[in-house]
Amino acid sequence: MAAAAGPGAALSPRPCDSDPATPGAQSPKDDNEDNSNDGTQPSKRRRMGSGDSSRSCETSSQDLGFSYYPAENLIEYKWPPDETGEYYMLQEQVSEYLGVTSFKRKYPDLERRDLSHKEKLYLRELNVITETQCTLGLTALRSDEVIDLMIKEYPAKHAEYSVILQEKERQRITDHYKEYSQMQQQNTQKVEASKVPEYIKKAAKKAAEFNSNLNRERMEERRAYFDLQTHVIQVPQGKYKVLPTERTKVSSYPVALIPGQFQEYYKRYSPDELRYLPLNTALYEPPLDPELPALDSDGDSDDGEDGRGDEKRKNKGTSDSSSGNVSEGESPPDSQEDSFQGRQKSKDKAATPRKDGPKRSVLSKSVPGYKPKVIPNAICGICLKGKESNKKGKAESLIHCSQCENSGHPSCLDMTMELVSMIKTYPWQCMECKTCIICGQPHHEEEMMFCDMCDRGYHTFCVGLGAIPSGRWICDCCQRAPPTPRKVGRRGKNSKEG
């Protein structure tokens, strides 16, 4: 009977001629197919390719008539079998195990792929598929997606499959233990007594290496750790020198609990600190308040305020010290006046460079009596000619950079005679070596501007400008210089008027 055929019915040459669920009845479509194929012409069967895996799954499920598929036959394998492989299941086996007729149409969102020839041979070696199935188009599904599907929609099937997995894991551990015990029984050869000390040394050496590596890893990589219970990052405590017990022993009266109670601890004052205390008469005035750093952009008003504050503090300190000394009927010693004047001078010196430091650095760039560099065989970097002739064919002396070997004619550099005379009074720099006079840095060339009188370079942010000004700009160094008339005629006119 067809009902008793079992799984062997799936291998019959005509598996789709009869329905195993209704062995005694046939559909009109089957009658028509029998009438058309009554021996005159054999029926044509299309060979299924790799794209017809879902149809083969549907056909096999129909042929089996939702017969029971044991969970032991649902195989999970790894492909590729190396470390980079992932775990997969065959869609045909999953559909038979879950009893789904059209698995691909019911779950189209699952990631699936066709098996390659090498993968089929690998499964054939593992006895997962038969030789007949190697010629069919098989589809692989990701095992994690299949497990999630079974948990959500087929909990009973998943529980049955979990039991099988646990039994397989238990059997694997048992087999591994048996192999290990057999290896121990085979390797029961006795160790020579003379080699035992050598083996002990090797074992101790290996243990020492492991301990050293572990300690080094703890010190370098795992010094701090995050405590999950307190949400605190634990960091090892630093190393401290421990004093001997005699030095840290607590006395009988360490500290006074109420005012006037005896205690053995007392503060030790230095001689300089005692001079400020009014034991009989204070030798020193109260110490001055610490100065706060003033911003450079405050201007001259801060200088005036600082000067007035210093004057007030000075007068106040003098009056305090004089009043205290007069009340006791003593004259201030010479050492007090000297120390007071010394502190006041040091304070003034400390306050002065804070305000005038940049200005002094600018003025220090112009060296009195400076002699420019002399290069005998110098060549202009623009016209490539010497001092004998410039680009106009006239003899003209060259100016030289103080930092490098570059030289040039003033006419080639579009410099006036006044600018050339000013350049020769300080170490002039060419465009490639130009640095800011205030900060001394060559960076931020887009913010660098040059004085029209001396050709010194300045950063806009070093002189307090937001952008490079348009038109003529003169630096602070040239503004402080005495004005010199430029034209001979105007100088003569002024002399006549005078």
Curated annotation (Swiss-Prot):
The modification Phosphoserine is found at residues 12, 36, 50, 270, 297, 301, 327, 331. CDD domains: PHD1_PHF10, PHD2_PHF10, WH_NTD_PHF10. GO terms for molecular function: chromatin binding; histone acetyltransferase activity; transcription coregulator activity; zinc ion binding. Residues 1-10, 285-296 have a biased composition (Low complexity). Its main location: nucleus. Gene3D superfamilies: Zinc/RING finger domain, C3HC4 (zinc finger). It is found in: Nucleus. Disulfide bonds: none annotated. Residues 89-295 are annotated as: SAY. Keywords: Acetylation, Isopeptide bond, Metal-binding, Neurogenesis, Nucleus, Phosphoprotein, Repeat, Transcription, Transcription regulation, Ubl conjugation, Zinc, Zinc-finger. There is a cross-link at residues 241, 385 (Glycyl lysine isopeptide (Lys-Gly) (interchain with G-Cter in SUMO2)). Residues 1-62, 285-368 are annotated as: Disordered. The modification N-acetylalanine is found at residue 2. The keyword Zinc-finger applies. Residues 345-359 have a biased composition (Basic and acidic residues). Residues 318-328 have a biased composition (Polar residues). This is PHD finger protein 10. The lineage of its organism: Eukaryota, Metazoa, Chordata, Craniata, Vertebrata.
